[in-house]
Amino acid sequence: MATICALAVVLAGVAAYGWHVGWFAKSTSNGNTTTPQTSQTSALPRADVPSPKKNEPAAQAQRAVSAMTLEERVGQLVMVPLFAGSDPSSLASTITDEHIGSAILIGNWNTGADTVKTATAQLQGYAPAGNRLIIATDQEGGQVQHLTGTGFDTMPSAVEQGTMSADALRQSAGTWGSQLAAAGINVDLAPVLGTVVGDRASNAPIGALDRDFGLDAAGNAEHGIAVIEGLRDAQVGAAVKHYPGLGAVSGNTDFTTEGILDTTTTLGGAEAGAFDQAITKTDPAMVMMSLATYQSIDPNNPAVFSSTIIDGHIRNALKYTGVVISDSMSAEALSSYDVSQLGVKLVEAGGDMSCIGQTDYVKPIVDGLNERAKSDPAFASKVTAAATRVMALKIKMGLA
């Protein structure tokens, strides 16, 4: 969801999960645990990734995933929504029964940090002690700030942030990130790195809402990097979005299937280049994929389902090994697809995590992933690789 899905949250006390400071300090210089039966895991594929040193997060993640059942691996690939005003207990059975690994706080959480902290702590209580939840939210600033009230600063819009120096913005982002961390949020689905190329008012998802930094691609990259680094200073992960940019479409993918064909963006162009620079310089926790279609890149698939963009460019060209997450799978832009195949198509393209903005989408997406993986060994290998990337992120963040 272009305006909703910027989501991931973790339990309040940062020290409680033993954050891996080395990863969070990277600069631009470049017990409810279950013991699965052997018969459930021995035949499952290993992650198809290079063999890392045994103490590196990737190696630890491989070991963790090798001990998981298929259903547990699939659960790591799903982010479920908790809406403002909803009781966290409404997700208890979903998290435990489906082995869900991530949650997102959606809506107008306007009663302050204590309310959020209580909710995130309750959510974490449903997860195994050795595999805590990623908990995210959209906290961009301006019109897209889901958490407000005592304990959360009123954040300026991204356009206003674009008038700040990079150093000042990094410092401010560190403050905002510290507020998120104290409330139990560990991933901020920000910053938006799209570059608006035409009339701002006619660009419904970004320009009309002042969600970009209001600069050229180079300036947007510089300010996006500052936000990523500021959040990392606060031990909060960032999700750059919406790759490769929504600045050249007129329609908002959350609400329409019209006006979401980008006819100008290319992988070698400045707009996608802003993302590429931020990704290669900061190695963000996540890259969120756009739901628009890019005529000059892959005219047959939205970016979220494009192996050309994810496997071909983000994975192979940029060498990004982090988590690739969808924008909201329940957005109108994807309404023509079979819900049970949404997560499948993301993983087939090289992606990892389905961000879900509507509760009734969760079960069919989970079931679709499980059914395909059980019948298709090649797809099961992709599930294993995706779960390994998610677990590597959790290990870096001290969640597993």
Question: For each of these PLM feature ranges, what is it?
Answer:
Residues Y126-F152, S172-G198, N220-P244:
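Glycine-rich, aromatic-flanked loop segments that form ligand/cofactor-binding clefts
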Residues A84-T96, A168-Q179, A272-Q277, D338-K345:
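Short, acidic/polar
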Residues P377-A400:
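Mid-to-C-terminal alpha-helical segments outside catalytic/metal-binding sites
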Residues A47-P52, V80-G85, L105-T111, S157-Q171, ...:
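Second-shell loop/turn segments in exported
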Residues G75-L82, G101-L105, L133-Q139, V187-P191, ...:
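Hydrophobic faces of well-ordered beta-strands that scaffold small-molecule active sites
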Residues M1-S27, G31-I134, G142-Q145:
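N-terminal hydrophobic targeting/anchoring segments and the immediately downstream early-domain regions
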Residues F83-D87, N108-G112, Q139-V144, V187, ...:
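Solvent-exposed loop/turn segments at secondary-structure junctions
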Residues T69, D114-L123, G219-A378:
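Second-shell residues forming the walls of enzyme active-site clefts
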